[in-house]
Amino acid sequence: MPKILIVEDSPDNMRLFRTLLTMRGHDVVGLAGGDGLLETLERDRPELVLMDIQLPGKDGFTLLAEIRASDHRGLAVLALTAHAMSGDRERALAAGFDGYITKPIDIRAFPVQVERALAGERPAR
């Protein structure tokens, strides 16, 4: 099954995401913040990254820019955010995220969104 990297600073959210994805057979790697992101991508070679936008230190937009400037530029990255304001989805997609998931997640829709991203489906920009 595909390997998925979750970049999320909330232990509760990390636990929930990991549980939902491992129940579907995915291999999940977790990172509590942006430190070591590129090294983790190099070491673990995930097929998809789920990244919180609001992280301590570097935010998700900064980390996405680092991914897009690296050898992993083509990697699918979905934005995760609890601060869903008007225009946030468009801003995330314009910045280069391949999708956008709001928290709290819908536990039935979340795995479907992940599967679609793994299948290469991207939202209209």
What do these predicted ranges mean?
Residues 8:
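Conserved acidic carboxylate
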Residues 11-29:
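Two-component/phosphorelay signaling modules centered on CheY-like receiver
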Residues 12, 33, 59-62:
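Acidic catalytic/metal-coordinating carboxylates
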Residues 15, 105-114:
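C-terminal output helix
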Residues 25-34, 39-40:
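Short hydrophobic/Thr-rich beta-strand motif most characteristic of the beta2 strand and flanking loop
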Residues 39, 61-73:
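Short amphipathic alpha-helix used as the core "switch/output" element in two-component signaling
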Residues 52, 81:
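Active-site residues of response regulator receiver
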Residues 56, 70, 85:
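The feature encodes the CheY-like receiver
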